[in-house]
Amino acid sequence: MQVMTSRFGTLEINPSDLLHFPQGIPAFEHLKEFFFYPIPENPAFTWLQAAADPEVAFLLVDPFLFFPGYAVDLPARLQEELAIKDPADALVYAVVTIPDGDIRRATANLVGPIIINPTVRLGMQLILEGTKYTTRHQLFKESFSDDESIPSSGGNEG
């Protein structure tokens, strides 16, 4: 199937690659189908593109690469809704915000992780309650000069 996107042009997507978000994503509840659009030069990041709206895409990051102490307990309700048999099999991503397009100031939303069951291709955004996490955790602690690249690394596989 062909999907129009504002960032990546027209993409050919296999319907079996779609991820179904039964409840949508907060503020985008009307959008139920998404797909990953990887960033080959930096596999720590990927895009989560809405299949039905070319303007809606979320930059995701594997939070465990940047925040080694990060922990998410998956509630039984979520495990049931996403048919997760073993929480270790779930993919966990954080939504990234890049203020004014400056990657050096990028932040990750650790209070609202995106949880994916890759086996059955179901996902949802979990809002953590009573946590120390916030919606804006600085990704890069050090400054990068304009000619330095940001290091890439692997993590979640999706």
UniProtKB/Swiss-Prot annotation:
Short name of one Pfam family: FliW
Membrane-spanning parts: none
Cell compartments where the protein resides: Cytoplasm
Keyword Chaperone on entry: yes
GO cellular component annotations of the record: cytoplasm
Keyword terms, alphabetized: Bacterial flagellum biogenesis, Chaperone, Cytoplasm, Translation regulation
InterPro entries in UniProt: Flagellar_assembly_factor_FliW, Flagellar_assmbl_FliW_dom_sf
Keyword Hydrolase: no
Example GO biological process: regulation of translation
HAMAP family with a match to the protein in the record: FliW
Oligomer and partners: Interacts with translational regulator CsrA and flagellin(s).
Family under the similarity heading: Belongs to the FliW family.
Protein role: Acts as an anti-CsrA protein, binds CsrA and prevents it from repressing translation of its target genes, one of which is flagellin. Binds to flagellin and participates in the assembly of the flagellum.
PANTHER family given in the database record: FLAGELLAR ASSEMBLY FACTOR FLIW
Name of the protein described by the UniProt record: Flagellar assembly factor FliW
Lineage: Bacteria, Bacillati, Bacillota, Clostridia, Moorellales
Gene of this entry: fliW
